[in-house]
């Protein structure tokens, strides 16, 4: 038998429900803030960042390298450990890479990289370093820190070994950046100097505290900063305006060793979407591009390779070449006979 509740009974029940609802909302808010999914204001002005989990990687690295559903792929000698992902061990002639499977279509973003480089080698007897990529192609092994040469996109290099002889202008390890449209080669013998956008010294080997690198791309402005002093403070390294990067490229990181070696470890990669205000003029200027470039920096234009000839086209070329050759021979014989006839008439 149902018991009727008076006005005071309904009020008490409604108040209890309201309290439970409010508690649930507060718990949900705390969970979101604790997981990093909520927006966070960064810098001056109306700029907020949102963690994008589909482009981020952190411990415990579940499924990386083993599951087909993982958002990240391993390549080469890269291996998953409990506390980090090792791109290359401290052994000669190794290379490895870690690539995101999801293309990034964000307009403005910030990538925070937590890494560690360490090994047994003494001064200038270690190498070669690691690279962070935002490129059109992924999973393409090659000579540029374990990735393909003539890449299309952005490469940021943490170079630990000076290849150029009599190098006195810069101290290694050295961070540099390069934008490529697929037409440029990375010059190992000169440590990439002919094509670099800028760089700075970064003493990152065999440190006993965490080392971080951040790559920020906002309003076609590329900024690279580092936190390598154990002070939890970002220090400027590279700042380049007018950098045009297409959307839909892939994030990755790679490393390579040669005669010299090091352990190259990645602890985490965290990508944040940055929301920034744009004026109508900026909206017009910041339209999507289809090929990487840098304002006021001339990159060689890509020349499309000629398409291969079809079988019919090749047959026609050979056929008409033979016809032309036969025609030329016949004309030559006729002219020669006429010349001989004229020569006989002169003597008789």
From Swiss-Prot:
Keywords: Disulfide bond, Endoplasmic reticulum, Glycoprotein, Golgi apparatus, Lectin, Membrane, Metal-binding, Signal, Transmembrane, Transmembrane helix. One of its GO terms (biological process) is endoplasmic reticulum to Golgi vesicle-mediated transport. Residues 39-313 are lumenal. PROSITE patterns: L_LECTIN_LIKE (PS51328). Residues 49-274 form the L-type lectin-like domain. It is found in: Endoplasmic reticulum membrane; Golgi apparatus membrane. Ca(2+) binds at residues 159, 161, 163, 191. One of its GO terms (molecular function) is D-mannose binding. May be involved in the regulation of export from the endoplasmic reticulum of a subset of glycoproteins. May function as a regulator of ERGIC-53. This is VIP36-like protein.
